[in-house]
Amino acid sequence: DGVCATALAPPGNCTDHPLWPPVVGDWVALADAAQNHGEAAAHAVEIMPRTSYIERPAASGFGLSQAIAANVDELVIVEPLQPAFSIGRVERFVAIAHASAIRARVVLTKADLVAGQEIQGAIEQCEPLVESVTALNTTDTQAVAELKESFTPGDTLVLVGRSGAGKSTLTNALLGTSLATGKVRAADGKGRHTTTSRQLLQGEVNIIDTPGIRALGATPDAEAVDQTFTQIAALAEQCRYRDCSHSGEPGCAVGQALTQGDLSPEVLGRYQRMRRESERNELNRDARLARQSQRTASRDNTRGRRETMRLKGRGN
């Protein structure tokens, strides 16, 4: 029989561990199992080393982030074609995948609601970003079966996207499960949060379904942003100045490509906005971590002084 880990707060000082608390996808060591109302309860005492860790930055900035999952092999970006496909949102998710050093793919849903020209346009925008782009209707069993065959058996996938994108519907189709799905408002095409927590569902592939994300900040990893916009990163290597901001400096290869029509101004604009936000989030994150480190050091010093006083009291 399995053991149910009903206590996340472990004995001892495990909460001081840098990996604490555990997130969906974590492997944990359990101890102190005891029978409780016919079920085994246990304390999680250690988090096993992670192969990957995905977090998303808060849209508000301030260096805050929210964990998505751990030990994931592939980020599946579920982006609806209706009511409004957003390449900017896809780019931000791809940057998060690069920051986590995992693969990413794009699944374009609601392909039955738009014209073929729109589908092809969305695919062409996504293709430079990821290795695999699929457009489908989640009720098309053959298309879903082909998508399922493209996954590596045994991999752990995490589905991310906006509310109403069809993540839970896609999960149901892939695994034959029955997660709750919600209706999409006809007025604006936005869905409600039917998935309110992250959960790991096991099958031929392990799928983590996540709540919809309404606003997505830029990863604080500026290098991951450059990895997302590969065309601009390659051009930047040819700029005269290493710290070129691509804003009109002499010898700017990016500006030259823009003038010659080889680079879209919309792509450059999205890159510059994400890069600026990424650098700002990185500064805020580093400042927050420094404050946390100071508080931890102060707490440890206080504990040390108390222990010293206790030992001195014993000596008397």
Residue spans for each PLM region:
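Conserved beta-strand segments of the P-loop GTPase G domain that flank and frequently precede/overlap
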Residues: 76-81, 107-109
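Beta-strand/loop nucleic-acid-binding surfaces
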Residues: 2-22
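Switch/coupling subdomain of P-loop NTPase systems
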Residues: 43, 63, 70-72, 83-102
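Structural motif
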Residues: 76-78, 158, 207
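Walker A/P-loop
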Residues: 163, 167-169, 173
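Conserved ATPase-coupling elements of RecA-like P-loop NTPase cores
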Residues: 86-90, 115-120, 217-221
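Helix-rich effector regions associated with P-loop NTPase G domains
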Residues: 17-27, 31-41, 48-71, 103-104, ...
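Canonical P-loop GTPase G-domain recognition
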Residues: 103, 112-165
